[in-house]
Amino acid sequence: MEDYKQRIKNKLNVVPMEPGCYLMKDRNDQVIYVGKAKKLRNRLRSYFTGAHDAKTTRLVGEIRRFEFIVTSSETESLLLELNLIKQYQPRYNILLKDDKSYPFIKITKEKYPRLLVTRTVKQGTGKYFGPYPNAYSAQETKKLLDRIYPYRKCDKMPDKLCLYYHIGQCLGPCVYDVDLSKYAQMTKEITDFLNGEDKTILKSLEERMLTASESLDFERAKEYRDLIQHIQNLTNKQKIMSSDKTIRDVFGYSVDKGWMCIQVFFIRQGNMIKRDTTMIPLQQTEEEEFYTFIGQFYSLNQHILPKEVHVPRNLDKEMIQSVVDTKIVQPARGPKKDMVDLAAHNAKVSLNNKFELISRDESRTIKAIEELGTQMGIQTPIRIEAFDNSNIQGVDPVSAMVTFIDGKPDKKNYRKYKIKTVKGPDDYKSMREVVRRRYSRVLNEGLPLPDLIIVDGGKGHMNGVIDVLQNELGLDIPVAGLQKNDKHQTSELLYGASAEIVPLKKNSQAFYLLHRIQDEVHRFAITFHRQTRQKTGLKSILDDIDGIGNKRKTLLLRSFGSIKKMKEATLEDFKNIGIPENVAKNLHEQLHK
């Protein structure tokens, strides 16, 4: 089976049974189709099983990968689908490129307005609400409002009263001089309802139901009860499309197994037009990691600042405000909080997919290690041991080792190391110390040696490890280095005396195994480092300076990166990031003692 088909098959197994939208992409990573589904897994699987018509067969033949976004309802999926189609204009979405395919409810712009269901939007002729998933949904909503409000029904004003007046569904403006303020109040209540504010209409119906019941008019009370239930069933909170046109970005995140996923929803003109997904290996607490991310998001990544930024309530608003120069909102309830929760839920789904795909791929690990051995020109590495260091500015340096046997993690043979002999942030010396300690003990206790050692790093790390193994311990074990790109993703495997790149295809099983190993050793190392920091506390020269607490210390480290950079900074540099002048002077003096 071709590699892309295998990847698609693997990913289909971890798609959730939830509503949402999906994006099909071709070999050039272009979006060629956008769709929605009540159950994402079932819909996506249907594309890759069974027979299809000619158009769908052509579409499936071009698909090389897919993405999906989870929503809270089928209606949200529709609204998001429309926004995504407008954004990407996929060539296979011919039938969905125009909003006219979907019905809207319209309040006409007349002296005595009418309620209409229409598929044509003409600006200046009235207010439009929607779109609705289908005509039935729009018609049911209109019928409900017709039963509650005696709005005008006739297209042209007749000369005499019609049936609607006699059954109480029209005030008869064709004959009577209807109070315009009363009509305007009805229009306001209908508008509020169509914008998702159903509390007013529900309260009114509940009062009518109670009055009818007290008057022993049980038939009328039952009718009001049925209307209330109908509204509750029909009303579907539409978080993806809002009548609020404020430009805002919505942030949500999830943390698991040493990784953090942050999702950003870009809301423009009430629509979610785009999202951004970022995976980050946790180096600090989740809160500190988020502050660092959001500060860089609008500076390094040059995203345009919106009018509002919405973030979870567990975060420190002042910390975020110090690095993001716009209004920070932490919604406590309602649709805005729902949107933050939805971003967090999508982040959780993304993390789950990452880990589930890893676990499902364990059945192919034997092939992976065979392929790895062939490409490196060594015997099949049955036992692989991988190392990674973790520290912040040289504080509490630690290292960790993970063991993979037959391409699968062997957790009982994982090891943790506190760096003992190295002062300051020196990755090379730290790696030499840990390798020396590990394999001295292996030799002394007669433990099994690995077939391959992998270090998280490049040529410098590899040479240091090889020197310790060969010249100090007399061991000849293959040593390889794994490097990452600027997105923290495994990018290349280095091997040999000159640390040459091993020609592995990025979509090969061997490369994916290396990605798993690097992720796992990194997770294990930073988890151990966080545990160590929690016990000892993060100590630095900043701890002894008056006016510098944890928040300002984090702000300084995030802004300057190191004590050395702070010593090079001016008073103005400190003031520019929000440090008060008196504290900045004290800080400057202490750093230059």
From Swiss-Prot:
This is UvrABC system protein C. Keywords: Cytoplasm, DNA damage, DNA excision, DNA repair, Excision nuclease, SOS response. The keyword Acyltransferase does not apply. Signal peptide: none annotated. Belongs to the UvrC family. Interacts with UvrB in an incision complex. Its main location: cytoplasm. HAMAP family: UvrC. Disulfide bonds: none annotated. SUPFAM superfamilies: C-terminal UvrC-binding domain of UvrB (SSF46600), GIY-YIG endonuclease (SSF82771), RuvA domain 2-like (SSF47781).
